[in-house]
């Protein structure tokens, strides 16, 4: 069978992360279950399988990318039909036989939605803190990883209504790096302690109460994954199904937020 790649969007909140784990529900576990039900494979995992990234529990994705050897009849729409609503496959690409969704990715982009409705006065401080984390640094104090911690980040902050939107792009990321970058920016924005950034980026380990914890995973989205020479085709039926599903989820959340706002008026 030919190697094929698929774009996957998912609401990560119901899942214990992307990567398969025993005894808990994960996005990859749901993908494998769907493929087994469709008789695409019957082993431990599909031949040639790899994914662009391993998002943490609660993190969502717009363009997670998985690739494996798959029959031509497996369209995104057919794939989605065997999946639960929070997971939607919406595009596909024919890939070379040696294609690897992890190793062949040239860039990954994450977006973090920081709810800050009453904090416009400190937007410049937040942007300045993020700017100091942009570029090439050793982020050993912002990840549990102990090796390969030097990364080059391109990060920006924009205001969108009640939200500060942080966009971070890199060739690859250490574990929890984006969430800890956001957490550090939030701390510096709140306290004005810009020296904290120099300490965290320094050579000495920063741990315990002085360490930087990861920010809440729920506002984080894996927005894009780029590959050289790979052209994805949007399955319009699958894409429309995804839009309808996520619009319904958005409406539900708006209603819940309105009720919570009413209760907060006590």
UniProtKB/Swiss-Prot annotation:
UniProt-recorded Gene Ontology molecular function terms: pseudouridine synthase activity; RNA binding; tRNA pseudouridine(38-40) synthase activity
Keyword tRNA processing tagged: yes
Gene3D superfamilies given in the database record: Pseudouridine synthase I, catalytic domain, C-terminal subdomain (3.30.70.660), Pseudouridine synthase I, catalytic domain, N-terminal subdomain (3.30.70.580)
Catalytic activity of the protein: uridine(38/39/40) in tRNA = pseudouridine(38/39/40) in tRNA
Pfam name, any one: PseudoU_synth_1
The family this protein is said to belong to: Belongs to the tRNA pseudouridine synthase TruA family.
NCBIfam families documented for this protein: PRK00021.3-3
Name by which UniProt lists this protein: tRNA pseudouridine synthase A
Species this protein is from: Halobacterium salinarum (strain ATCC 700922 / JCM 11081 / NRC-1) (Halobacterium halobium)
